[in-house]
Amino acid sequence: MAAPRAPRALTAAAPGSGKAKLTHPGKAILAGGLAGGIEICITFPTEYVKTQLQLDERANPPRYRGIGDCVRQTVRSHGVLGLYRGLSSLLYGSIPKAAVRFGMFEFLSNHMRDAQGRLDSRRGLLCGLGAGVAEAVVVVCPMETVKVKFIHDQTSSNPKYRGFFHGVREIVREQGLKGTYQGLTATVLKQGSNQAIRFFVMTSLRNWYQGDNPNKPMNPLITGVFGAVAGAASVFGNTPLDVIKTRMQGLEAHKYRNTLDCGVQILKNEGPKAFYKGTVPRLGRVCLDVAIVFVIYDEVVKLLNKVWKTD
């Protein structure tokens, strides 16, 4: 009869045991929230440009000729701070989003690791999928809906939202809570696939780098490079879902019956290239985003391990 499987503790194994250190979900929530807040302050301008290009539909005709033109027009009309319009709505969402993502990932992965505390790539993908779905439902969908509506409103000739909280009140007053959950299906698909790809790549690269020693220290530079690779993979893997999600959450979402109809209309009216509109600015943002988040997350966890002992 096989011996019972050794229990998995949430503390570091004794030196020389070869068992991987596990991260307490509470630490993951704190570290993830901090990493998410810092990252969004650095990368928001590229997110703003990406959203503008995706909302700049061909049928209008287009307002911008490209990334550079979008930046020039924004700075000319609103100054450099114009590239940060809508930051508050994304910042309020980014902190809890990263907290939920990493907290859920560590919670799931701590129950899916082998007796040595290692997480293989396949299980890393599943844990990433679970983390992505959790952040989509709890945080991303309502916050992204408000963000897209706010940015879209500010570019109209008669903006009606005076700020983030005023925008939220108006959206809820006019459309109810349902108004903050537009594009939920697309968001769940997008975030789920996003984090599944990122954590799959990150887990694979970590396992390759650490080899037979799961506790081999990760240099922040190496973590950043791995994070950038994971981010790039997620961009090429799910940009079409990101485009559909943005359309479903914009002020003209009423044009589409559902997520599938949105995709069909984009393909029919604008062609397949429309699904990759905004890819270049998104690629730059996401690679930097994921690299920053993983580096800060890992470093904060290391610090927390010194001051917060978990059993």
UniProtKB/Swiss-Prot annotation:
GO terms for biological process: mitochondrial citrate transmembrane transport. Pfam families: Mito_carr. One of its GO terms (molecular function) is citrate secondary active transmembrane transporter activity. The keyword Nucleotide-binding does not apply. Residues 1-13 form a propeptide. It is a multi-pass membrane protein. Solcar repeats lie at residues 23-111, 122-208, 218-303. It is found in: Mitochondrion inner membrane. SUPFAM superfamilies: Mitochondrial carrier. It catalyses: (S)-malate(in) + citrate(out) = (S)-malate(out) + citrate(in); citrate(out) + succinate(in) = citrate(in) + succinate(out); D-threo-isocitrate(in) + citrate(out) = D-threo-isocitrate(out) + citrate(in); cis-aconitate(in) + citrate(out) = cis-aconitate(out) + citrate(in). The chain crosses the membrane at residues 29-46, 86-105, 129-143, 183-202, 224-241, 278-297. Possesses a short cleavable presequence, which, however, is found to be dispensable both for targeting to mitochondria and insertion into the inner membrane. However, the presequence is required to keep SLC25A1 in a soluble state and thus in an import-competent state. Mature SLC25A1 lacking the presequence is prone to aggregation. The keyword Cytoplasm does not apply. Its main location: mitochondrion. The modification Phosphoserine is found at residue 156. InterPro entries: Mit_carrier, Mitochondrial_sb/sol_carrier, Mt_carrier_dom_sf, TXTP-like. GO terms for cellular component: mitochondrial inner membrane; mitochondrion. Keywords: Antiport, Membrane, Mitochondrion, Mitochondrion inner membrane, Phosphoprotein, Repeat, Transmembrane, Transmembrane helix, Transport. Belongs to the mitochondrial carrier (TC 2.A.29) family. Mitochondrial electroneutral antiporter that exports citrate from the mitochondria into the cytosol in exchange for malate. Also able to mediate the exchange of citrate for isocitrate, phosphoenolpyruvate, cis-aconitate and to a lesser extent trans-aconitate, maleate and succinate. In the cytoplasm, citrate plays important roles in fatty acid and sterol synthesis, regulation of glycolysis, protein acetylation, and other physiopathological processes. This is Tricarboxylate transport protein, mitochondrial. The gene is Slc25a1.
